Amino acid sequence: MKRVINSCIAVLLGVAVMSAVIVLCSENPSVSLAAFFLKPFSTRGYIRALFHKAGLFVCMALGASCALKTGMINLGGDGQIYAAGFVTALLLREYWGVGFLLQWSVALLCALSVAGILACVSGILKAWLATSEMITSFLLSTACVPLIDALIITVTRDPAGNLLATAPVHSHFILQQQTSLFGVPAVLTYASLVALAVGCFFSYTRVGYQFRICGKAPEFGRFVGFPVWATYVWGMVLSGALFGLTGFFSVVGLFGTCYVGFSVGMGYAALAHALIAHAHITVLVPLAFFFAWMETASEAAVLGAHLTVNVVLFLQAAIFLLISAQWSAPWNAVRRGARRVYRFLVTVFCFRGEKHRTRRRHALSVHDTHHRRSRWE
């Protein structure tokens, strides 16, 4: 319950901060607020883009949540998504003549492998040298981004004249026009199935149980004989592979190409998403629609209402600042104070005679028993 309260307060305050920024930075606040809150649902194209972004947010949040469940924090999401998208664009820009499904599967496997290897380096350094995975993953991501930028601009630039993107993906590999059950975009459907598989892995498999135990209590994991070092490595590999899946779906689903800097901010958005959900897989999918709505609404406000500030950044900042606050602490202090006042009143008014003393002891024992029971429940 405390986690739910903290998450709800962080989200509400983040939305309030974004609304305040829109009012302060816009020349016409009413038009900007209307564009922010209503325009994402105004047309079918906006709704379709919202569903596509929700699928990407599910994959991103799964990557961040898998790292959190194993006791790690993967800050290299931007670089891992970027590398996977770049590899996908290179492998799918032309048809090889071996079957579309086979080529699509090879590109997917390569994208997952590249991102998983980048994350695996941080896991190995954590397991063998006890280095911080946050620092190593962030540094590797920071090193990969300018390297891929240079490759896109020089070697793999679109020969048709686009200076900031690779050649577009072959039309047969694009998921943008593909739909699945009830008209839901294919990206969101595939991402939901992946979320279901990851949730079953952590909840109903022996290896997933070991991952969760070693992530929460590594000393206990070592005591019972679990390979904690393997948890670090494979947890980061799984996190990187899911970030790579995000890059793959970004190229074949939403963008159709790999352009310079398309993954900027995705890693931190995924971390904010996972922190709000407290790494609960079942919460990630519905929460993805909220984050997709926020990003779509911010773009609509910037384009339609001439807003010069990307307010999604303020949402992420508010979440990072507020998610760690213990908002239930004041309520617990009030409960403790009320309990002390109750004990004082019982002591004052039940002091005369053996009958009153017995009644006082009984009242205090019943109150303490109820408090202990409610505390454990």
UniProtKB/Swiss-Prot annotation:
Membrane topology: Multi-pass membrane protein
Molecular function terms, GO-annotated: transmembrane transporter activity
Keyword entries, A-Z: Cell inner membrane, Cell membrane, Membrane, Transmembrane, Transmembrane helix, Transport
Disulfide bonds: none
Regions that span the bilayer: 4-24, 49-69, 72-92, 98-118, 135-155, 182-202, 223-245, 249-268, 274-294, 303-323
Compartments, record wording: Cell inner membrane
Major location category of this protein: membrane
Subunit structure of this chain's protein: The complex is probably composed of two ATP-binding proteins (RfuB), two transmembrane proteins (RfuC and RfuD) and a solute-binding protein (RfuA).
Pfam family, one: BPD_transp_2
Annotated organism of origin: Treponema pallidum (strain Nichols)
Family (UniProt): Belongs to the binding-protein-dependent transport system permease family.
Gene: rfuC
Protein name, UniProt field: Probable riboflavin import permease protein RfuC
